[in-house]
Amino acid sequence: MLSPIQTFLGQHNLDGFLFVGDSICDADMYYLSRFLAGDRFAILAQEKTTLLVSSMETGRARKESIADECLSTSQYQIMEKMRRCEKPEEAYLQVLLEFLQGHGIKRLGVPFRFPAGIYQSLLQDIEVSVSDSPASRWREIKRQEELDAIACTQR
């Protein structure tokens, strides 16, 4: 049986769905990762969930998140790229593209609130479509552990 993300990706003819932001402001990112971070990171939702975080957050992400895989931007030589690029954002965009290509992404979905600059950059190499976040729909239906936590909080 296909997982909800596999079903969503198949219905939309996508190789993955990407979130970039912080999980304090983006409930979908927290829902998918259970990793609470105020700094920007990326989540690639495919059959497995992969986080791309800064090297300072890698250990904590591996320990706290429910992601299948946690990768560091340093694995993609972000510091070397930063030395070569005029702007740090350009280095991050190169890392992100390398990360996505390494995960076989040719057709990518992103949520409506996705950062515009990153979206425009990715369009040069990847087919990107914007849609509602699948995680927003999944968050509407509470799992038993979530219902228990709500009940406990309301007592």
Feature annotation, model-predicted:
Residues 1-98, 155:
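N-terminal accessory/capping or targeting/presequence segment of soluble
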Residues 88-155:
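Flexible, acidic/His-enriched mid-domain "rim/lid" segments that flank
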